[in-house]
């Protein structure tokens, strides 16, 4: 008996830079190419972050739009999940791209300690992001980092 599963690919993340690994796809074109390779290998869902030209994380809706349109062309039928993570912005701008038509988005349900930072997710922000997701028909990926 087989068990159905969804393979998710997170090709960039918000931390790695080219200096850490030259193969990390940073530009939109690199991300599309890398995601397409994963899609062709069987990945069904892409969890995506976008970057500025200096490789820093961003919540820039224009970058997300460019990536989304490219992924829709290169990977038809793939589920696209936007990151609303805190390393790419503070407050409401973390949800500024949810109107673009992604299928899913991450929804962190609390704050936690990462090795070098506090990943802050204020209850008001969580409610705001959840409301925006509902408003635009985006399915949340509920993230629970710390149960304490």
Task: For the regions a language model picked out, list residue spans one by one.
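Active-site beta-loop-alpha junctions enriched in small/polar residues
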Residues: 10-14, 51-53, 83-87, 108-112, ...
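Glycine-rich, proline-tolerant flexible connector loops at the mouths of alpha/beta enzymes
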Residues: 19, 44-66, 114
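N-terminal small/glycine-rich loop or linker at the start of catalytic domains
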Residues: 1-23, 106-113
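Structural preference for beta-strand elements that scaffold enzyme active sites
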Residues: 4-10, 45-47, 77-81, 102-106, ...
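Catalytic alpha/beta core domains of metabolic enzymes, predominantly
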Residues: 104-148
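Catalytic cores of alpha/beta
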Residues: 88-100, 147-148
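Conserved, mostly hydrophobic/aromatic
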Residues: 31, 38, 49, 105
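Alpha-helix-loop-beta-strand connector modules within alpha/beta enzyme cores
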Residues: 3, 9, 56-82, 127-135
């Amino acid at each position: 008996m087989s068990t159905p599963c969804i393979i998710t690919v997170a090709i960039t993340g918000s931390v790695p830079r080219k200096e850490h690994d030259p193969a990390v796809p940073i530009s939109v074109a690199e991300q599309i190419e890398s995601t397409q390779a994963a899609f062709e290998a069987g990945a069904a869902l892409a969890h995506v972050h976008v970057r500025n030209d200096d490789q820093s994380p961003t919540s820039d809706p224009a970058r997300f739009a460019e990536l989304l349109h490219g992924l829709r062309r290169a990977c038809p039928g793939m589920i696209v999940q936007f990151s609303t993570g805190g390393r790419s912005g503070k407050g409401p701008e973390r949800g500024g791209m949810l109107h673009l038509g992604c299928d899913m988005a991450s929804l962190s349900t609390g704050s936690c300690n990462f090795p070098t930072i506090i990943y802050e997710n204020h209850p008001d922000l969580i409610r705001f992001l959840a409301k925006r997701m509902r408003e635009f028909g985006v399915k949340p990926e509920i993230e629970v980092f710390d149960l304490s």
